Amino acid sequence: MKIYQIDSSARKDGSTSRALAKKLLDKIKKPEDEVIYRDLNDEMVFVSNLTESGMKIDPKDQTETHKKMFKLSDTLVKELKESDIIIISAPIYNYGPPATLKAWSDLAARVGETFRFKPNGRREGLLKNKKAYLVITSGGTKLNSNEDFLTPWLKFILNFFGIEKVEVVSADQMSLDYEK
């Protein structure tokens, strides 16, 4: 079995989401399992007008930025396709996802790779028979409240890719001081 662990917190040391994801990985991983690890802060290309336009031009006319974006996108898609279990750790930043996690989803959303258009025009996710664990943390936002835009967005993205089995592990409102 292959487990794909994705960390998105900008904080390398002292990150609660990273620590909880590591504990979860240690709990579910069997000795024979292979782990694919990706820290989204190590290398991420943000989709811009320049990179988005690269999707519409002939590969021979692409710039180095286009080529770098497609190389990373191909790698992210391959990692998703090869995995059986996906663990995504993410803190809530300003009520939503870290920018690197949004960039990851933009680069992983590829027609014919992670989703397709059916003849009726509706979309269908192509990454079936996978399970995802979302390790979501927050300082003040209560998860699954009207202020939490990360959890429903990430569930939607995974479902869009065809991943329907999603379990949330959460530690929210960790910075609130209830003694005051």
PLM regions and their residue ranges:
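Conserved nucleotide-sugar donor-interacting segment of glycosyltransferase catalytic cores
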Residues: S105-N120
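Hydrophobic/aromatic beta-strand patches that form the interior of the parallel beta-sheet core
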Residues: Y4, I36-R38, Y133-V135, E167-V169
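Short, glycine-/small-residue-rich phosphate/pyrophosphate-handling segment
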Residues: R116-F160
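Glycine-rich phosphate/pyrophosphate-binding loop and the adjoining helix
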Residues: A10, L143-K180
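A structural motif corresponding to the C-terminal end of an alpha-helix
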Residues: E79, S83-D84, K130, F161-V166
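N-terminal beta1-alpha1-beta2 submodule of the flavodoxin-like/Rossmannoid cofactor-binding fold
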Residues: M1-A90, Y95-A103, R110
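Short acidic/glycine-rich loop or secondary-structure boundary segments that cap or lie
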Residues: F46, G96-P97, K142-N144, D177
